[in-house]
């Protein structure tokens, strides 16, 4: 029997989400991205299909985990039982070496009605961040970073650790919390037959996610009974993380695959072999940000200034598309364009 007492742990939200998607794909699921829900098809007042920008998707039941748009998706189905408004949170991220000696875990202030407060936290990858603040918004697309927000975060963080090295920040960003009208999670069967909501997920949304999943599964099975998949594959292929290996282990890996010897992202020591593996994996990366989230190429101090063009070239080659078709993240987020013939000859 293990006698060590576990007092705490951290996990990477991004890695966890990617792993769940990869597990689903290797068990027969299909992931469709950049796909807008436009309506629902019903028969006898039960949902039978979803209308989308990429065609009709037949469905015995639909789980609505639409984030800040969950209320809009529910309304398309005829469910007006809840509303969602966005609450923006801004963050500042530091270089790995910046605050490593100052922070070893999570430093919390006293929580308030809106949030747990502006905190200081280390990540599983070694960075430190401060944030978030909490600003109620009208626009569900507004993830802008503001000077006022940055001042608020820095002043609050300095109350916890006065000598934070603010000059070592490498990027700022913002995200949106999905706040329900009731202020609570919206979980379970909708008044519309065949629709199940998992909405209004504020903190502690990640911590609650496994329990929320069990609640949704229970509700779905009560509506649409199904057997457990007998040949379910839970284990995912494990690719080596080059930067975590010893020099001897790295040398052996390069002998097997020379692309491990080509470091594309020097800030995070990410190799071409790792990037290719991320592209070819189940639910593989299709964009520059997709590669970044899976491998950390572009997450270092230069924020992709060095490796960004090289990652783009690798994506184009592996996906069999021209460089101008490689996206940063969403539709129309092109990084490169074909030279206009009208520009020929210009200085």
Where are these regions (language model features)?
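Single conserved hydrophobic/aromatic residue that forms the stacking wall/gate
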Residues: 1-8, 12-13
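Hydrophobic/aromatic beta-strand patches that form the interior of the parallel beta-sheet core
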Residues: 32, 63, 196-198
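Short Fe-S-cluster ligation motifs
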Residues: 292-309, 325-347
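Helical element adjacent to the flavin cofactor pocket in flavoenzyme catalytic cores
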Residues: 10-61
